[in-house]
Amino acid sequence: MGRFILVNLGLLVVAFSLRGSEACCPCGWSSYDKYCYKVFDKRKNWDDAERFCMEQGKGGHLAALGSLEEGKFVGKLAFKKLKEHPTYVWIGLRAQGQGQQCSSRWSDGSRILYENWHPLQSKKCIALSKWTEYLKWYNHICDFTLPFICKFLAEPDDPE
């Protein structure tokens, strides 16, 4: 009996010490590395999708992808949500200025830390392609209406 109480007390201490270390996302959103993500299958052009994402949460934007691992996580979310549907999904990157040069920043203002362009793609508004399981970046005309992926910084699980 004493051992049972001691084990339960130990588990309780571990549970409380871990509390607050996880990110908390709203219902229907998925968390990865302190951020919340959601794939929306409603179709919007790039600018309207970015505006919509900004309305979803504090600091929300179309998803910026900072690493291959994050790209794989987002790709899996999109593939699961859009299995039998659209072939492209907007992310938070677009060309800026007169030329076809890509912006040096994502729509949330963060720097581009890695790139995963499909070969032969020029750079306009950027979408992920179903044919690459939503892993490779493709340019698309910004006025096309596509599904999109929003991202924002999660609230700590225990804001105290």
Swiss-Prot record:
GO terms for molecular function: toxin activity. Residues 32-151 form the C-type lectin domain. It is found in: Secreted. Disulfide bonds join 25-36, 53-150, 125-142. InterPro entries: C-type_lectin-like (IPR001304), C-type_lectin-like/link_sf (IPR016186), C-type_lectin/snaclec_domain (IPR050111), CTDL_fold (IPR016187). GO terms for cellular component: extracellular region. Residues 1-23 form the signal peptide. Keywords: Disulfide bond, Hemostasis impairing toxin, Secreted, Signal, Toxin. Expressed by the venom gland. Heterodimer of subunits A and B; disulfide-linked. This is Snaclec subunit A. It comes from Philodryas olfersii (Green snake).
